[in-house]
Amino acid sequence: MDIVAETQIEEESLIPDATSTPLETEVVADTTLRKTALHLAGVDNLSEEQVKGFISAYAPESQCTIEWINDNECNVVYADDDVSRNALFHLIMESPTEFSEELEYQTKPHPTVPTCQFKIRYARYGDKKVKSAHLYSRYYLFHGDPREEKAQKSKSKSRNQDERGSPLDERLGPKVSDLTLMERIFQVRRKPRKSRRDRRSRVSKR
């Protein structure tokens, strides 16, 4: 093999293959059971109030908080394992003969939204909201993002406060820099002048 042919082979070996795909690093979700929380699927188009209404209809004695994952899934979090397990058995459609903590079960119907069909199981630590999930939410698209509404209200309140001014500003009056030239002259003229008698009394006291 001559030098030219050998050099050509080496150059071809350095050219990357366009058809090959780079190695992708897959993030493996943590499947460890989180026994203080229940994973509820099928909550599309339901508000947090409606989800809690479903929970309280069958497990009213158990206080819970809602952790949203996406439009279709959420976690129902309880104080401890026993409360969570008790709520799970109250929410399942039919008590299974052989219960498995790993399986997902059909729930009882929503009391006011019977068309909803839920699936419930123990939550896992990998059941978390992805970053910027609100940007892909269909629920926020139709009903609005409460965080944006809160920010708008805060801006509006701040703007109104700036227009009205603070109570201290009302007591002190406008700043001198905010007054026009004529207003400054008028304000100086309004200041009371001391009489000659007052001046004489001060001199006599000295």
From Swiss-Prot:
It comes from the Eukaryota. Disulfide bonds: none annotated. Pfam families: NCBP3. Residues 159-173 have a biased composition (Basic and acidic residues). Residues 187-206 have a biased composition (Basic residues). This is Uncharacterized protein C16C4.16c. Residues 147-206 are annotated as: Disordered. GO terms for biological process: nuclear polyadenylation-dependent CUT catabolic process; nuclear-transcribed mRNA catabolic process, nonsense-mediated decay. InterPro entries: NCBP3. One of its GO terms (cellular component) is nucleus. GO terms for molecular function: mRNA binding; RNA 7-methylguanosine cap binding.
